[in-house]
Structure formats: C-alpha cells, structure tokens
A protein has these predicted regions:
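Membrane-interface loop-to-helix entry segments
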Residues: 108-120, 180
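Loop-to-helix transition at the N-terminal end of transmembrane alpha-helices
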Residues: 29-43
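Membrane-interface transmembrane-helix boundary segments in multi-pass integral membrane proteins
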Residues: 32, 160-201
C-alpha cells in the first residue's frame, strides 16, 4: 500500500508544481486560500514521498508526524474543494482567470487540478494507502486548524480595515448580510471535515 501512497503523492507533487509553477505573479500564492493550501500540500507530499522512498530502501519506520502532516494537508485541500463548490463554483465568484497564469495555461485546468484532482487524490491516499502509518496523538486535531485560522483571521482583518483589495469579496459591504454570514460555513465545514477524517483514518 505504501508504494501506492508514494505514487499518489508524487502525482500530487507533479500536479501542484505544474499548476502553481504557471502562476504569473508568485506573490498571489500568499493571497488566495486555494494557492496557500495547495502550496502546503505540495511541500507535505514532497516530504512524504522522500520519507516513503527512504522507508522502502532502508526499512526505517515512517514517523507519525509525517502522516500528521498529511492529515493537515488533506483537510486543507478538502476545505478548498468545499469553498470552491459552495462559494466560487458554477459561475459565482471565480477569481482565477487567464491573467493569473503564464500564457498557454488554462485557468479552467487550474481550477480542476487545485479544487478537484489534488483534494481527491490526497483523500484517497490518506484513507486507503497510508493506513499502515499510525497516527494517534490528538494534538493533530488542533494543529490541523492552524493554517486556515491564520489565513482567515488575516483575511478578515485586512478586508475589514481595507488594507488590501479583497480577493473573494466575502466581507464587502455590497454583499447581503446572508452572504457574509454564509462565510461562517467555511470554518464550520473545516471542523466537520477534520473531525470526520480523524475518526475514519
């Protein structure tokens, strides 16, 4: 199973490098939740792949924290998929355009890779192929929320103080009250995703 996990994580690395590598303004990686979570997933899958190769060659045990990082990355990717489907998909507020990528790379392909392919691959690998790597320390249920909490707190502070041009318009005064309140579904969904994934791991 570990070989399947290795292959799946290498595919994730290739998909992430291909997509994030074609972003025109690399500083935008710090602006969008999708880019940040996928960049984190890229790093984690790369680390996982290296550790898996070392394990397969030397027989060393893969430490628990490696699967803990995979848990964090998988929850983050699933949260981006949920956010995209609920708030940004179906022609609602898709902000990734051709201007965001180098010539010849389709934003449609970027959306498919970042919001569907990588999250699903990560989920399949975590639940099916990585089970032999035990994870039991409950601290990961707290660590998993750190990247998202940092992003969304920073996002709301910068948006409400008009310190940047808000990428998603979630906090815009032009939005209806319901639209703003509905953003609360994002942390709620993250709690549900992380809780469910932890209990079926």
């Amino acid at each position: 199973m570990l070989i399947k996990a290795l292959i799946t994580n290498l595919v994730i690395v290739i998909c992430e490098v291909l997509t994030l590598g074609h972003i025109r303004g690399k500083r935008n990686i710090l602006k969008y939740y999708t880019y940040l979570q996928n960049f984190l997933a890229l790093i984690v899958s790369l680390v996982f792949s290296v550790c898996s190769i070392v394990y397969l060659v030397s027989g060393r045990i893969i430490p628990e924290y490696i699967r803990g990082l995979r848990y964090v990355a998988t929850c983050g990717l699933l949260a981006t998929m949920f956010t995209f489907i609920v708030f940004l998909g179906a022609g609602k507020k898709i902000v990734i355009t051709e201007d965001d990528f180098l010539f010849g790379f389709s934003p449609v392909m970027a959306n498919i890779i970042l919001h569907y392919i990588c999250p699903i691959l990560s989920l399949v690998s975590f639940l099916l192929f990585e089970r032999e790597i035990k994870i039991s320390n409950g601290i990961w249920t707290a660590i998993v929320a750190i990247p998202s909490c940092i992003y969304w707190i920073t996002y709301m502070v910068l948006s409400l103080t008009n310190a940047w041009e808000e990428p998603y318009n979630f906090a815009s005064k032009a939005n209806k009250i319901w639209d703003v309140l509905s953003v609360l579904l994002i942390p709620l969904s993250f709690i549900v995703i992380s809780y469910t994934l932890w209990n079926v791991k």
